[in-house]
From Swiss-Prot:
SUPFAM superfamilies, per database record: Actin-like ATPase domain
Gene transcribed to yield this protein: glpK
Phosphohistidine modification, residue list: H230
Protein name: Glycerol kinase
GO cellular component: cytosol
Pfam families named among the record's database cross-references: FGGY_C, FGGY_N
Function of the molecule: Key enzyme in the regulation of glycerol uptake and metabolism. Catalyzes the phosphorylation of glycerol to yield sn-glycerol 3-phosphate.
Length: 496
């Protein structure tokens, strides 16, 4: 009987189930979108029950369409939108409020108060993160402070907190396992990434009772089994968990110190494996846990770019410059340069290394001769410049010089962008055959735990390159272009 690993990829807008075979190839997949709730400007919420329903639906669809029986599943891996926060009743398993999504800014005031009280340095030291509404801790506090009776129930031990991975493991196991993995715990603002424990001082700062928190476990081990009625009568091991960006780093087989990947989605997330040491950042990066496996924990430096693929969508939908995102490459290639035009797509502020949420988008160097092609090319180039900003910060913090950059996500199909990325970084850019690296990473973590794959060396041998982009631009030219970008950033920051 052929066996497979089932990966559950729970994202910000949809849930997916993907079946992988022994070679790490996709056998079949199913996807289902769910509702985004915007109760107030800047707030983003999901219905956690609807997310659970979407997961059950994609599991059923994927298995039936692939004609795979539940007993053929060797293990389940879970990867998830990180930081998104669910608080539910321990007895009924019902959420007491919507899931507060990572993008949601509804806890910005709580963050300002904590900063004013002087907690920033302590938080930075213990968690590797900044005090920001992005992370889970302030979201839990908000729910306890704003939902009637919640704080009392929490203090009585009747409520549980989890990021989406915890919520799904809880539901799949029928409430038997309340766990999370190191990678997800490291995004909560409540976990000490050095001693690998929930931190009493951080919990006190956020007034979150410890009894609510899940047990933190390695990213690759059997956490529990599915209960019969959720999985067509089968008890399948739930065996791998990692946050989406860390799962992508694992799926790209970036196991060595100094290896890095960049995911070009709505935004960009770049992670560099720093091995078994947590490198503190002096340049606006986050220090995070990549994964815990075989009794060891790997750390990573992470940079976030807020606008990447969404800039291409903006050209298509907002500016109506083309009908299909793939056309952006055709237009950009029609001109030899942007003719001095720079686009800074700071639609929601700037991420790493600037962390400026007040600044807005801008365009520079426009003349009467500027065409649509120049504008499209400049927008695409901005993704590469922002990635270079992050890489410069990573190299400065880690003291490691990048040898190659592995890439994944929607925008990597754009050959113009990948070639320009390689030129501006002056390192080769490698695009893998399997672009679904997030789901693949979760599958690998689960497969290792159940013995489906032997070790990381076997996984490394399965990573195959689709295309390698080599830098050919003169150093002088790329330095000049990047200097122009830095000037554009400074000018953008001045205009608020």
């Amino acid at each position: 009987m052929k066996k497979y690993i089932l990966s559950l990829d729970q994202g910000t807008t949809s849930s997916r189930a993907i079946l992988f075979n022994k070679k790490g190839e996709i056998v079949h997949s199913a996807q289902k979108e769910f509702t985004q709730h915007f109760p107030k400007p800047g707030w983003v919420e999901h219905n956690a029950q609807e997310i659970w329903g979407s997961i059950l639906a994609v599991i059923a669809t994927c298995l039936s369409e692939a004609d795979v029986k539940p007993e053929q599943i060797a293990g389940i891996g879970i990867t998830n939108q990180r930081e998104t926060t669910v608080v539910w009743d321990k007895t009924t398993s019902k959420p007491i409020y919507n899931a507060i999504v990572w993008q949601s800014r509804q806890t910005a005031e709580i963050c300002d108060e904590l900063k004013e009280k002087g907690y920033s340095e302590m938080v930075r030291e213990k968690t590797g993160l900044l005090i920001d509404a992005y992370f889970s801790g302030t979201k839990v506090k908000w729910i306890l402070d704003n939902v009637e009776g919640a704080r009392e129930k929490a203090e009585n031990g009747d409520l549980l907190f989890g990021t989406i991975d915890s919520w799904l493991v809880w539901k799949l196991s029928g409430g038997k396992a309340h766990v999370t993995d190191y990678s997800n715990a490291s995004r909560t603002l409540m976990f000490n990434i050095h001693d690998l424990q929930w931190d009493d001082e951080l919990l006190e700062m956020l007034t979150v009772p410890k009894s609510m928190l899940p047990e933190v476990r390695p990213s690759s081990e059997i956490y529990g089994e599915t209960i019969d009625y959720h999985f067509f009568g089968q008890n399948v091991p739930i065996a791998g968990v990692a946050g989406d960006q860390q799962a992508a780093l694992f799926g790209q087989a970036c196991f060595g110190e100094g290896m890095a990947k960049n995911t070009y989605g709505t935004g960009c997330f770049m992670l560099m494996n720093t091995g078994e040491k947590a490198v503190a950042s002096e340049h606006g990066l986050l220090t995070t846990i990549a994964w815990g496996i075989d009794g060891k924990v790997n750390y990573a430096l992470e940079g976030s770019i807020f606008v990447a693929g969404s800039a291409i969508q903006w050209l298509r939908d907002g500016m109506r410059m083309f009908k299909d995102a793939s056309e952006s490459e055709v237009y950009a290639s029609r001109v030899e340069s942007t003719d001095g035009v720079y686009v800074v797509p700071a639609f929601v502020g700037l991420g790493t290394p600037y962390w400026d949420s007040e600044v807005r988008g801008a365009m520079f160097g426009v003349t009467r001769g500027t065409t649509k092609e120049h504008f499209i090319r400049a927008t695409l180039e901005s993704l590469a410049y922002q990635t270079k900003d992050v890489l410069c910060a990573m190299e400065a913090d880690s003291g490691i010089e990048l040898k190659t950059l592995r890439v994944d996500g929607g925008a990597v199909k754009n050959n113009f962008l990948m070639k320009f990325q390689s030129d501006i970084l002056d390192v080769p850019v490698e695009r893998p055959v399997i672009n679904e690296t997030t789901a693949l990473g979760a599958a690998y973590l689960a497969g290792l735990a159940v013995g489906y794959w032997k070790n990381q060396d076997e996984i490394k041998s399965q990573w195959h390159m689709d295309k390698r982009f080599e830098p050919t631009m003169e150093a002088e030219t790329s330095e000049e272009l990047y200097a122009g970008w830095k000037k554009a950033i400074e000018a953008t920051k001045a205009f608020k």
